[in-house]
Amino acid sequence: MIFEELDYQETPMGELTLRRRTFNGADVFEVKLGDEYLMSSLFVVAEEELAHLGLAAHGDPKRVLVGGLGLGYTAVAALADARVESMTVVDALPAVIGWHERELLPVSTALVKDERTRLIHDDFFALMRRDPSETYDALLVDIDHSTEHSLDASHASFYTVEGLTLMAAHLNPDGVFALWSDDPPLPAFEAMLAQVFATTKSHVVSFDNFLTGGVSTNTVYVARL
């Protein structure tokens, strides 16, 4: 299919491309990192459910941290929750933040014009290893393909009991951690979550796959202290 390249950047993780094409008469926005497709605006149901399910698990999620900005659908879904008073979004790639600051994407304006939004250029995984300077009611994370398929080898230690314990220190009491994954629920990771959090649940989110004509699924893990 013919596409328009909206941005191209060399990054430490590879060539990052934002492009737009038409599918069934509508604009579709896609992100590629090297040869891998990271995300498409055709498939955002599970990204939005990451916010909905994560915030629903908390009684009063005033302060939210989103790990991974991407096309912005998780962040904007979080802002739709009136209980959220502030939302910090962390992304390791300044180009991605720039796309939204330039309002290149469908949800960019709603995201950057909301006074509750703060966009931060930082490595989310490195941030979780540091002593917390701020704590949050909910952490919503969508960066890697899954717990076993990371975009960078440096992310792997996050998906361990030690990594999850360090992350949990950034949560307030009764705080919630929610994670998107492209894979089915993984019992080994569910067991790790259960060692760190008081309650855990794995949600399988189904959505129509307009390319295959079938139904696809993602997983949203939700865990609460």
What do the predicted segments below correspond to?
Residues G25-M39:
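A short, structured beta-strand/loop element
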Residues S40-F43, E190:
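A short, polar/proline- and glycine-enriched secondary-structure boundary/capping micro-motif
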Residues F3, L16, F125, V205-S206, ...:
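Glycine-rich, charged/polar anion/phosphate-binding loops
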Residues D183-L225:
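Class I S-adenosyl-L-methionine
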Residues M1-F29:
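N-terminal auxiliary segments of SAM/dcSAM-dependent transferases
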Residues D174-S181:
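Conserved beta-strand signature within the Rossmann-like core of class I S-adenosyl-L-methionine
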Residues V44-P173, V196-S206, G214:
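The AdoMet/dcAdoMet-binding core of the Class I SAM-like
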